[in-house]
Amino acid sequence: MNDREKVIEARGICNRFGRQVVHENLDLDLYRGEILAVVGGSGSGKSVLLRSIIGLRRPNEGLIKVFGQDLAGLREEQRSLVERRFGVLFQKGALFSSLTVTENVALPLIEHAGLSRADAEHLAGVKLALAGLPISAADKYPSSLSGGMIKRAALARALALDPDILFLDEPTAGLDPIGAAAFDQLILTLRDALGLSVFLITHDLDTLYTITDRIAVLSQKKVLVAGPLAEVEQTNDAWIQEYFHGPRGRAAEQAATRAGQER
């Protein structure tokens, strides 16, 4: 893995809110084509880290390189070109309630790619199909969609500009187990088909056991450990041991083992 290209390289990241220090000297890499899961206890700063990487928050200290470029050092137009290579799915979906599903997905194509409304809406249909939404959902408003359909619509919008990196913040939160498993498999399929690099924040142990290549654990204001699941779960840390070897962790591991035997 270490011989592969780093698409994100974070070094010495510090994030503070007044006197509260969330991250201190945090280092993290995302390699091309991998699915990296970021986990940690409440208050460990997972979403703050995501926002720092995608440019919604500037760290108090540290360097973030994306595709080898220091985002903080780029001019606005250069930075915009880099950020167009991001696709972001926020935890709540963040769809515009006054727009239909198709219009939500078409909007970035109109605003950032300069497509006509007709062309943007045609391409939006392609993205909706990629995300596994039925044609019948295209003209609906977010308020009439189920939680799973909202996630898929938001994913279609995240894919609108053909990103290289997909950022997912708790993508299976609020989904039932069947819906969550289907969404996990969709992410895996899209990664393989489109060559995406995926930065995934999750609490879902089933996700960790079924689709991730590496896991980074945020603890003590830094990345305590990052590596394959088999390596991470053996780390001598109280939170890690409880998380991976408690009742829920054991159940997720057993489910993943059964699924592997059935393939």
Show the residue positions of the predicted features.
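Helix-to-loop junction immediately C-terminal to a conserved catalytic motif
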Residues: 54
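Conserved ABC ATPase "signature" region
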Residues: 70, 118-136
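The feature captures the beta-strand-to-loop junction immediately N-terminal to the Walker
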Residues: 39-41
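Conserved ABC ATPase signature
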Residues: 141-145, 149
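A short, proline-enriched helix->beta-strand linker immediately N-terminal to the Walker B motif
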Residues: 160-164
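Catalytic Walker B motif of ABC-type/P-loop ATPase nucleotide-binding domains
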Residues: 166-169
